[in-house]
Regions:
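NAD(P)H dinucleotide-binding glycine-rich loop of Rossmann-like/cofactor-binding domains
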Residues: 89-94, 101-173
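Short, Lys/Arg-enriched N-terminal segments with co-localized hydrophobic residues
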Residues: 4-17
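Short, glycine/polar-rich helix-capping loops at beta-to-alpha or helix-loop-helix junctions
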Residues: 116-117, 198-206, 275-281
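Mid-domain Rossmann-like dinucleotide-binding core that forms the NAD(H)/NADP(H) cofactor-binding site
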Residues: 143-221
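C-terminal capping/lid region of NAD(P)-dependent oxidoreductase domains
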Residues: 19-21, 318-325, 333-356
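Glycine-rich phosphate-binding loop and adjacent beta-alpha segment
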Residues: 245-319, 352-356
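Glycine-rich beta-strand-centered segment in the early N-terminal region that forms part
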Residues: 46-63, 72-115
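Short amphipathic alpha-helix with an adjacent loop that forms part of the alpha/beta core around
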Residues: 223-232
Length: 356
């Protein structure tokens, strides 16, 4: 049984016991910027588990730009979230009850969960499966540098970008969880790295902490002019998280045999009408360039390759990462909005509860 509570713009949160499962449901598909109108708070009973199933309690949620794509009713690499269903999200959870021989109560796992306190998961199924956290790895590490964002940076740059020593790498969305790691891996591979980010604080962090050679502040600078200035010999790899006018500006400065890694297009996700594509795609032809998109789910069989390499770089201090941690179940809808307004600094996470 599900009970929903709404009071104008406010949500009425009630005291709950262990028998109640709080949820945030997708109430309406977004048209433009995501807002409170897209979600509804609900309460339901904690589900029972069947054979080979595991009941988990969600401790921490991941917020990722691609969640906007899961909310719209169009074909994608995952089915859209249904209206009236809990919103999908990556999570670190604790096993509460298990009918599966490989999982025991108390263990921490990473999975594709939802915006709710409790969930039933089936090991071996779902986009990400159900994976135990490696020893010594915290929930925030598992959902940031060692999770989807870190693996996206690693495989996108290494497999599609194929960096070579001495090349110039341009990164949009450079202060984000993925972009900041892309730039640091590129530096480790002997490349010169130029980032594009928004705001003085983020730009300073990228040069002073993450080791970028230069950063363009799109909020206060002419991006096209600054790309030309900071990439006088053009760029060899453009790792694009933003799309839109930034992609078009970058394509004017592609080097011979340059590679564009299409990771995301956050500047267009909340558009109310289709955004026009770049008008200068012929630059790929004249420069024999390559533009390729990718989905991290295709690389999951190689996940440990990325995790082991990233763990080593973090342990040695060669890679740093930032986490923007929100707290409180009631703050979930407001937290996802931070991604699309540029308020977050680093990987956006939200803590629901501590492990028991």
């Amino acid at each position: 049984m599900r009970a929903e509570f709404e009071l104008g713009a406010e949500i009425l949160f009630q005291e709950f016991t262990m028998s109640i499962n709080r949820q945030w449901l997708l109430a309406a598909r977004p048209d433009g910027m995501i807002g409170p109108q897209n979600f509804t708070y609900a309460e339901t009973d904690i589900p029972d588990i069947g054979d080979e199933e595991v009941l988990v309690k969600n401790l921490m949620l991941s917020f990722d730009p691609t969640q906007r794509n899961w909310m719209v009713d169009r074909p994608g690499y995952l089915p859209p979230v249904e209206i009236g269903a809990p919103m999908r999200a990556g999570s670190v959870s604790q096993v509460v009850q298990s009918n599966h021989p490989d999982f025991a109560a108390g263990e921490l796992v990473q999975t594709t969960g939802c915006w709710q306190d409790y969930a039933v998961v089936t090991p071996g199924k779902g986009p990400m499966g159900v994976n135990k956290l490696p020893p010594g790895v915290s929930p925030e590490m598992m959902l940031s540098i060692l999770g989807i964002t870190g693996m996206t940076a690693y495989f996108g740059l290494m497999d599609i970008g194929m960096p070579q020593e001495g090349e110039t790498v341009l990164v949009s969305g450079a202060a984000g969880a993925t972009g900041s790691v892309v730039g640091q891996i590129a530096k480790l591979k002997g490349c010169r790295v130029v980032g594009i980010a928004g705001g003085e604080e983020k730009c300073r962090w990228l040069t002073e902490k993450a080791g970028f050679d230069a950063v363009i502040d799109y909020k206060s600078e002419d991006v096209a002019a600054q790309i030309a200035y900071h990439c006088p010999d053009k760029w060899d790899i453009f790792f694009d998280n933003v799309g839109g006018p930034t992609l078009e500006a970058a394509l004017n400065h592609i080097n011979l045999y340059g590679r564009v890694v299409l990771c995301g297009s956050i500047s267009t996700y909340n558009a109310t009408r289709p955004e026009p594509g770049p008008s200068n795609l012929m630059s790929l032809v004249t420069n024999r360039g390559r533009m390729q998109g990718f989905i991290i789910l295709d690389y999951l069989p190689r996940a440990m390759e990325a995790i082991e390499q990233l763990m080593g770089w973090v342990a040695s201090g060669d890679i740093v990462y930032a986490v923007d941690m929100a707290e409180g179940f009631n703050n979930i809808p407001a937290t996802i909005q931070r991604l699309y307004t540029g308020q977050n600094f680093g990987k956006q996470l939200l803590k629901i509860a501590d492990p028991e």
